[in-house]
């Protein structure tokens, strides 16, 4: 059998192009705040982002002299220094306004405004407030800070989208990140979204339904393509019965009642969801089975293990996790992230 070996879709090029278009059309809004300027990966990424015109400007949180001196250690940054703003929370002119806002958000009896000032001066908290006030379009962090710190600050400060009850996350899996046999191309041009992989530990039916709806929206917003959502399980269409499968079935009914036009099905085993030959045998009438591009896992164990299996054994490129459900784009990086991964996450935050 002859196979076709070529790259049909480059996710990185696609996202970079979208980011550049946004920058061109929305210059004053196309900026990112990086609160972790002490990390050399963040500084290198900031330089690359500006040189590739993936953002109009960058805000770095820290002591101005320290940050500028660190930047100047990279010989290739002189041409973009004018597009970098270094902000020190301790000398920020609107710090009292930020403190007032943060205090109003806490809703804690007996807590004085001044007692919260140390928290507001924290780089992550301060950066989230900058996004809330519209000083920056997006906050990209997590290279140094834990996911718990990033998420807790975002939950306190960044409003949710209207109607959203829970925040969740998704991974973008690029299964065609290198030249491969395109006769076995999964998802949308080799791209699949996995959710939830990092936030909601054991979602109930309502939460699972919301994760599915949010992930479908994220897929459509990012790729401008039609989502086909599979609610995964160890069972396909009643092949096994347990409380775990009932949770998935209930989630399916909730989604269909809320958004009847969405292509979604469940419960589906993984092979039924993505392999057409298997889908033909197990669930021929399904409009999703065999061609799903958004995979919703029943719990965090399955989602987290699942994406890492695909990344390590299938050599897919894993981007994320990306938070969804917030009204502002927030990215929680892995502490093991590379410069390239920071650049990609930043471009994605600008493009949406």
Curated annotation (Swiss-Prot):
One GO BP annotation is: acetyl-CoA biosynthetic process
**Cytoplasm as a keyword?**
yes
Annotated Gene Ontology cellular component terms: cytoplasm
Q: Pathway listed for it?
A: Metabolic intermediate biosynthesis; acetyl-CoA biosynthesis; acetyl-CoA from acetate: step 2/2
Enzyme Commission code(s) on record: 2.3.1.8
Cite a single GO MF annotation: phosphate acetyltransferase activity
The record lists the catalysed reaction(s) as: acetyl-CoA + phosphate = acetyl phosphate + CoA
Principal cellular location given in the protein's record:
cytoplasm
Q: Does the keyword Kinase apply?
A: no
Q: Where does it live in the cell?
A: Cytoplasm
Q: Which UniProt keywords apply?
A: Acyltransferase, Cytoplasm, Transferase
A Pfam family matched by this chain, by name?
A: PTA_PTB
Transmembrane feature ranges: none
Which leading EC class covers this enzyme? transferase
InterPro entries cross-referenced by the UniProt entry? P_Ac_Bu_trans (IPR012147), P_AcTrfase (IPR004614), P_AcTrfase_dom1 (IPR042113), P_AcTrfase_dom2 (IPR042112), Phos_Acetyltrans/Butyryltrans (IPR050500), PTA_PTB (IPR002505)
Q: What's this protein's family per the entry?
A: Belongs to the phosphate acetyltransferase and butyryltransferase family.
Name of the protein: Phosphate acetyltransferase
């Amino acid at each position: 059998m002859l196979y076709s070996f070529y790259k049909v879709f480059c996710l990185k090029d696609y996202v970079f192009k979208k980011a550049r278009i946004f920058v061109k059309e929305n210059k004053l809004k196309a900026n990112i705040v990086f609160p972790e300027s002490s990390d050399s990966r963040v500084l290198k990424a900031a330089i690359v982002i500006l040189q590739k015109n993936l953002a109009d400007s960058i805000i770095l949180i820290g002591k101005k002299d320290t940050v500028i001196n660190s930047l100047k250690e990279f010989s290739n940054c002189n041409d973009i220094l004018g597009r970098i703003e270094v902000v020190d929370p301790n000398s920020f002119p609107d710090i009292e306004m930020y403190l007032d806002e943060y205090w109003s958000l806490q809703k804690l009896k007996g807590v004085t405004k001044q007692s919260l000032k140390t928290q507001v001066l924290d780089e992550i908290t301060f950066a989230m407030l900058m996004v809330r006030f519209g000083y920056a379009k997006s906050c990209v962090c997590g290279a140094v800070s834990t996911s718990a710190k990033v998420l807790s600050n975002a939950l306190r400060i960044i409003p949710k989208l209207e109607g959203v009850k829970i925040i969740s996350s998704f991974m973008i899996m690029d299964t065609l990140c290198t030249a491969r046999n395109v006769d076995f191309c999964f998802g949308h041009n080799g791209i699949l979204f996995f959710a939830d992989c990092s936030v909601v530990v054991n979602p109930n039916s309502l939460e699972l339904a919301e994760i599915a709806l949010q992930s479908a929206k994220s897929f459509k917003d990012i790729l401008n393509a039609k989502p086909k959502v599979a609610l995964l399980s160890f069972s396909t269409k009643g092949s096994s019965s347990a409380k775990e499968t009932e949770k998935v079935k209930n989630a399916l009914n909730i989604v269909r009642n809320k958004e009847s036009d969405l292509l979604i099905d469940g419960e589906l085993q993984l092979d039924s969801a993505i392999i057409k030959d298997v889908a033909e045998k197990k669930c021929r009438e399904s409009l999703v089975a065999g061609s799903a591009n958004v995979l919703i896992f029943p719990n965090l164990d399955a989602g987290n293990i699942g994406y890492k299996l695909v990344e390590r054994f299938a050599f897919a490129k894993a981007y994320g996790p990306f938070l969804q459900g917030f009204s502002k784009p927030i990215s929680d990086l892995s502490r093991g992230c590379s410069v390239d991964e920071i650049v990609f996450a930043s471009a994605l935050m600008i493009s949406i």
